[in-house]
Amino acid sequence: MRLVVVGANGRMGRELITACQNREDIELSGVLVREKSPFVGQDVSILIGSAPLGIRITDDPENAFSNADGIVDFSQPQASVIHADYAAQKGLVHIIGTTGFSKEEDAQIAISATRTTIVKSENMSLGVNLLANFVKKAAKALGAHDFDIEICEMHHSKKVDAPSGTALLLGNAAAEGRHVALKEVSASGRNGYTGERKKGTIGFACLRGGTVIGDHSVIFAGLNERITFSHSAQERSIFAHGALKAALWAKNYKNGLYSMLDVLELNN
């Protein structure tokens, strides 16, 4: 399968380029960076410190996507919306690991997914998506009257959005388990005199510092007992592995908007 890596000079872009090079079933056909990037025109090897690969870095989507079967996209929300439209026009699989979308941007991607196959997930890690499945089941079994839910996440100091996309994925899983909308029960940013915790809310605590790739814990706190589900990302390569797995899965599926839960057959 021939793939283009979008956001190639970012942390995840570099991981994806390396991951593609280590696979026999995937060929890196192009890389795309932001317009007027200083990397434009150079061999992609400059991004991963390897021998020349014969692939030129470009900021032109038409050029990058011309010989591809799919796109793997860890960029910015506005850019991912544009790439989804390109993918729909050309019939390319689109794997989206970008986070921080607005409701309007999500709606635009959903429209593009009527014309091509898109897998969009706040976290491409196989472990995190299995964790989300556990959280949903636990939330269903442990009712709001008996157990409070708190989600704690920590990321590196350069992360610009909070709560993290993964924390929201886990929050949505918990909310689905209790048949409520996360936006109606979410609680974050506690400070000063807050009063007692409101029953049924799902709390978020967001920590930032150092080079932490991603730590997430979901705590079910009841009377005299506490259950904690947690996941710690040791390397970004786990996200690249999941994204490539999603691309290979998506090439055999009909048009539509899917998530990693679909890829892992956890949505049933």
From Swiss-Prot:
GO biological process, one term: lysine biosynthetic process via diaminopimelate
One annotated Gene Ontology cellular component of this protein: cytosol
GO MF annotation list: 4-hydroxy-tetrahydrodipicolinate reductase; NAD binding; NADP binding; oxidoreductase activity, acting on CH or CH2 groups, NAD or NADP as acceptor
Enzyme Commission number(s): 1.17.1.8
Residues where NAD(+) binds: 7-12, 97-99, 121-124
Subcellular location: Cytoplasm
Pathway(s) per entry: Amino-acid biosynthesis; L-lysine biosynthesis via DAP pathway; (S)-tetrahydrodipicolinate from L-aspartate: step 4/4
Catalytic activity from the UniProt record: (S)-2,3,4,5-tetrahydrodipicolinate + NAD(+) + H2O = (2S,4S)-4-hydroxy-2,3,4,5-tetrahydrodipicolinate + NADH + H(+); (S)-2,3,4,5-tetrahydrodipicolinate + NADP(+) + H2O = (2S,4S)-4-hydroxy-2,3,4,5-tetrahydrodipicolinate + NADPH + H(+)
Signal peptide residues on this chain, from the entry's feature table: none
Binding positions for (S)-2,3,4,5-tetrahydrodipicolinate per the UniProt entry: 156, 165-166
Residues of the active site: 155 (proton donor/acceptor), 159 (proton donor)
InterPro entries: DapB_C, DapB_N, DapB_N_CS, DHDPR_bac, NAD(P)-bd_dom_sf
TM regions (residue ranges): none
Keyword flag Amino-acid biosynthesis: yes
Coiled-coil segments: none
Chain residues that bind NADP(+): 34
Top EC class, one word: oxidoreductase
Record keywords, A-Z: Amino-acid biosynthesis, Cytoplasm, Diaminopimelate biosynthesis, Lysine biosynthesis, NAD, NADP, Oxidoreductase
Family: Belongs to the DapB family.
NCBIfam families: dapB
Cross-referenced HAMAP family: DapB
Cited function: Catalyzes the conversion of 4-hydroxy-tetrahydrodipicolinate (HTPA) to tetrahydrodipicolinate.
Protein name in the entry: 4-hydroxy-tetrahydrodipicolinate reductase
Organism this protein belongs to: Bartonella bacilliformis (strain ATCC 35685 / KC583 / Herrer 020/F12,63)
